[in-house]
Amino acid sequence: MFQDAEEKPRTLHDLCQALETSVHEIELKCVECKKTLQRSEVYDFVFADLRIVYRDGNPFAVCKVCLRLLSKISEYRHYNYSLYGDTLEQTLKKCLNEILIRCIICQRPLCPQEKKRHVDLNKRFHNISGRWTGRCAVCWRPRRRQTQV
């Protein structure tokens, strides 16, 4: 489909423009499991501001299940260290709102309120493969392990 590296769109919006289609109609396969993404997974991919990858010139995204699995594997294999918000600002000499911090689980970029929540609750941000992670509001909630009576 796209052979030249220069012409390969990296975002889903750019890919839709190149293919003259919309986010609501495009069909992409998962780069890991090769299944076609569900519509909600396509929207999640856009919302998380993830990048398209290419295999043999064809565009691929990643499904929700594979993304969570890859995030967990990356956390185990490439964890470097953790810092509190204030220390992170001092280390990078930037305000938290200027630092790209993604959710450690779903990879969505954290908004200023989610970053503030980490600071207010004295939670750390984690450096994994040189990228900063925390938890978004959706993934922050603990999951119930069993039915409570």
UniProtKB/Swiss-Prot annotation:
Keywords: Activator, DNA-binding, Early protein, Host cytoplasm, Host nucleus, Host-virus interaction, Inhibition of host innate immune response by virus, Inhibition of host IRF3 by virus, Inhibition of host RLR pathway by virus, Metal-binding, Modulation of host cell apoptosis by virus, Oncogene, Transcription, Transcription regulation, Viral immunoevasion, Zinc, Zinc-finger. It comes from the Viruses. Its main location: host cell. GO terms for biological process: DNA-templated transcription; regulation of DNA-templated transcription; symbiont-mediated perturbation of host apoptosis; symbiont-mediated perturbation of host ubiquitin-like protein modification; symbiont-mediated suppression of host cytoplasmic pattern recognition receptor signaling pathway via inhibition of IRF3 activity; symbiont-mediated suppression of host type I interferon-mediated signaling pathway. A zinc finger (unnamed) spans 30-66, 103-139. Forms homodimers. Interacts with ubiquitin-protein ligase UBE3A/E6-AP and thus forms a complex with human TP53. Interacts with human NFX1 and MAGI3. Interacts with human IRF3; this interaction inhibits the establishment of antiviral state. Interacts with human TYK2; this interaction inhibits JAK-STAT activation by interferon alpha. Interacts with host DLG1; this interaction leads to the proteasomal degradation of DLG1. HAMAP family: HPV_E6. Plays a major role in the induction and maintenance of cellular transformation. Acts mainly as an oncoprotein by stimulating the destruction of many host cell key regulatory proteins. E6 associates with host UBE3A/E6-AP ubiquitin-protein ligase, and inactivates tumor suppressors TP53 and TP73 by targeting them to the 26S proteasome for degradation. In turn, DNA damage and chromosomal instabilities increase and lead to cell proliferation and cancer development. This is Protein E6. It comes from Human papillomavirus 58.
